[in-house]
Amino acid sequence: MLFLGQKALLLVLAISIPSDWLPLGVSGQRGDDVPETFTDDPNLVNDPSTDDTALADITPSTDDLAGDKNATAECRDEKFACTRLYSVHRPVRQCVHQSCFTSLRRMYIINNEICSRLVCKEHEAMKDELCRQMAGLPPRRLRRSNYFRLPPCENMNLQRPDGL
């Protein structure tokens, strides 16, 4: 019976606490503001970013230079932001007077990363040709200056009724 009294006291206490007293949202749930990185993808590795000066001393072998002579001339390293939002459950301890309890709260962690990919000229040309085919345009070698132009490929999916 004593256990029922504690539940009733906790219920009355939860109802009587004003809603603005409870910290809602992401800010204010933890005391430390340490940015954490989480990933569920096993292919991604959260290594610390390397500095360009640290990589300046590393020279590729002659085999790598011979094989990549044409690739480096037509390819470039493109950097892009790959920001992810992760949802995690964190234990949060709340104390009211002398009684404390721990609850699991959902927190959202933003993982800001800069990713890079190798973009080659021939891949861009293939993508451009595929985009032209999807838009109903002729291949680039048969293009005439007075041919009707459609919007770019990225916008075509938005204009189709089934593209949503």
Curated annotation (Swiss-Prot):
GO MF annotation: an example: extracellular matrix constituent conferring elasticity
Record's GO cellular component terms: collagen-containing extracellular matrix; extracellular matrix; extracellular region; microfibril
Alphabetized UniProt keyword annotations: Disulfide bond, Extracellular matrix, Glycoprotein, Secreted, Signal
Predominant location category: secreted
Motif Cell attachment site boundaries: 30-32
Residue positions the entry lists as glycosylated: 70
Keyword Signal listed: yes
InterPro entries, A to Z: MAGP
Compartments, as annotated in UniProt: Secreted, Extracellular space, Extracellular matrix
Phenotype upon gene inactivation: Mice appear normal by several measures, are fertile, and have a normal life span, but are neutropenic.
Post-translational modification: Forms intermolecular disulfide bonds either with other MAGP-2 molecules or with other components of the microfibrils.
Pfam family, one: MAGP
Signal peptide: 1-28
Example GO BP: definitive hemopoiesis
Top-rank taxon: Eukaryota
Membership in a protein family: Belongs to the MFAP family.
Assembly and binders: Interacts with TGFB2. Interacts with BMP2. Interacts with FBN1 (via N-terminal domain) and FBN2.
Name of the molecule in the record: Microfibrillar-associated protein 5
Source organism per UniProt: Mus musculus (Mouse)
